[in-house]
Amino acid sequence: MAPLSIKGVLIHQEQVLLLLNERGEWDLPGGRPDPGEDHRGALKREVREEAGLEVEVGALLDEHLFEVLPERFVKIVAYGCLLVGASAATPSYEHLETRWVPLDELGETIAGHRLPAGYLGAIRQAISQPRAPSDRDV
């Protein structure tokens, strides 16, 4: 059975939060639940640890297998997230960079780095869902 990683799609002011990992790929914030921790609790903790942000976890967006390395798979479970508080993200030691990427700049590569197809699919799923009125530009 593949290990589990809970990921969050955090969209704020028509931008999505991405993290650049050590493999040079864009990543969604998230990670493995601690023993006894549910998906939502794990995701809130991971976003806080990886980006210094507080979130509320929303709807399940996607589940898929991701081939991290040849023949090494991780089960990804992605949820929509809503930012609570400030939007200034700070990268942890686990990532090289955090970036709020404008939704109209999303693609298979961003700034010369690959965005895995499963993550792009989860982001597109989140975009298609209604967001909080306070998150829309006026």
What are these regions (language model features)?
Residues M1-V16, R32, E63:
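Conserved N-terminal beta-strand and adjoining loop/helix that marks the start
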Residues N21-G24:
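C-terminal lobe/hinge of AMP-binding adenylation domains
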Residues W26, Y93-V138:
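Nudix hydrolase/Nudix homology domain
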Residues M1-P3, I11, E71-V74, Y93:
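A generic fold-level signal
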Residues L65-A88, R99, L103, A122, ...:
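Active-site-adjacent beta-strand/loop module that shapes the phosphate/pyrophosphate-binding cleft
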